[in-house]
C-alpha cells in the first residue's frame, strides 16, 4: 500500500460543530489566547484555564464525526494512512481512523504540571487539587503557545515518506505545523482542501480544492480509490 498522510486542522471539526478560535463566533471569543493557552496564563490563573478546557471537553460529548472524518477512515482500506492532526478532539478516533498523531495534545488527556510523561485519560471536569502520582497538579495535556511540540520530529518523518499528502481544514497559519508539507518528497502528490485554499501562496505542485472538508472528500474519494487500485502514485 502507498503511504498517505493527512494533515488536519480545525476546519474539519468545525463541520461537526466544534467552534474554532480563529472564527469571529468561536469558543475563544472574549478570551485572550495567552490567558487560557499558555504557561503564563496557567501560572497567573489556573482556575480560568481549567474552566476553559472543561468547557471544551464537555463539548466533545455533544458532537460526532462528520462525513469527512469517516471518509479519511475509509481510506485505510486503500492506503497506509497516518493522520497528523492539529485538533485536540477525538473525532478522528471515533470515525475509525487507527493511526493518529495529535501534534497539539488531546482534550481527553491530562498530565502532571511537573512531569509531561505522567499522562492520564480524563473525561470529567479537571479541578484544582486533582493530582498526578508525583503529587503535582494535573493540567490539560495540551501543547500551549510557547511550548515545544514533542511529536514534531515524528510528524516530519511521516511526511518525508509520503506518496500522497492531503491537507484539510487548516489555514496553514499555525507553526510549526503549517510548514510540515514542505518536508514531502518532490514527487509526492499534495492536495490542499480549504474554503480559502486558492488564496494561499503555495508551490505549484500543491493542488488546491476550494471547498469545505465534507464536500471536498465526497468529490475526491472516487479519484483517491482509483489511484490506489491502479498504482498511479510514484
Curated annotation (Swiss-Prot):
UniProt keyword Translocase present: no
Top-level EC class: transferase
Positions of the catalytic residues: 104 (proton acceptor)
Gene3D superfamilies: SIR2/SIRT2 'Small Domain, TPP-binding domain
A Gene Ontology molecular function term of the record: protein-succinyllysine desuccinylase activity
Keywords for this protein: Cytoplasm, NAD, Transferase
Compartment(s): Cytoplasm
Residues that bind substrate: 53, 56
Residue intervals of the Deacetylase sirtuin-type domain: 1-234
Listed EC numbers: 2.3.1.286
GO-annotated cellular components: cytoplasm
Reaction(s) catalysed (UniProt annotation): N(6)-acetyl-L-lysyl-[protein] + NAD(+) + H2O = 2''-O-acetyl-ADP-D-ribose + nicotinamide + L-lysyl-[protein]; N(6)-succinyl-L-lysyl-[protein] + NAD(+) + H2O = 2''-O-succinyl-ADP-D-ribose + nicotinamide + L-lysyl-[protein]
Main location: cytoplasm
Keyword Transferase: yes
Binding locations of NAD(+): 9-28, 86-89, 169-171, 217
Family: Belongs to the sirtuin family. Class III subfamily.
PANTHER family (UniProt xref): NAD-DEPENDENT PROTEIN DEACYLASE, NAD-DEPENDENT PROTEIN DEACYLASE SIRTUIN-5, MITOCHONDRIAL-RELATED
Functional note: NAD-dependent lysine deacetylase and desuccinylase that specifically removes acetyl and succinyl groups on target proteins. Modulates the activities of several proteins which are inactive in their acylated form.
Record note on domains: 2 residues (Tyr-53 and Arg-56) present in a large hydrophobic pocket are probably involved in substrate specificity. They are important for desuccinylation activity, but dispensable for deacetylation activity.
Protein name: NAD-dependent protein deacylase
